[in-house]
């Protein structure tokens, strides 16, 4: 009898951060470049990590997974609820920092396990981030 596949699903009601991991700053010390996160990126990582920690699965994923993420940005009144957001930030930049935070929180052993990824961003009356993780 096969083991039941793990699945995790949750919604984090929040205004999603728009700062992304791509926004590294560089300082030069003793002739060597030092990369660091500017304060807004550091704050975004802390916000995501604090919210994600509440939804950590009972055990880490250790096999291939599908990650479905829906980023719901606050509607500015110019868009319909659920309309696709086709402006910055880019989905790949959002996802990189998000997966790094999920790794830090212990969702999986390594984000290389994410073999299938669906990421969408919308304008929404109720902002937040919807997440679903499925074992493949």
Regions found by a protein language model. Give the residues of each.
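Acidic, proline/glycine-enriched N-terminal capping motif
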Residues: 2-136
């Amino acid at each position: 009898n096969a083991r039941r596949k793990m699945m995790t699903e949750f919604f984090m009601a929040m205004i999603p951060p728009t700062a992304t991991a791509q926004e590294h700053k560089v300082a030069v010390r003793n002739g060597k470049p030092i990369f660091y996160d500017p304060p807004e990126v550091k704050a975004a990582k802390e916000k995501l990590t604090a919210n994600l920690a509440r939804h950590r699965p009972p055990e880490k994923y250790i096999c291939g997974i599908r990650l479905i993420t829906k980023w719901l940005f606050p509607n500015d009144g110019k868009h319909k609820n659920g309309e696709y957001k086709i402006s910055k930030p880019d989905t790949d930049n959002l996802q990189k920092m998000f997966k790094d935070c999920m790794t830090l929180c212990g969702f999986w052993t390594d984000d290389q396990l994410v073999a299938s990824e669906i990421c969408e961003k919308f304008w929404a009356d109720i902002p937040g981030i919807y997440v679903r993780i499925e074992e493949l």
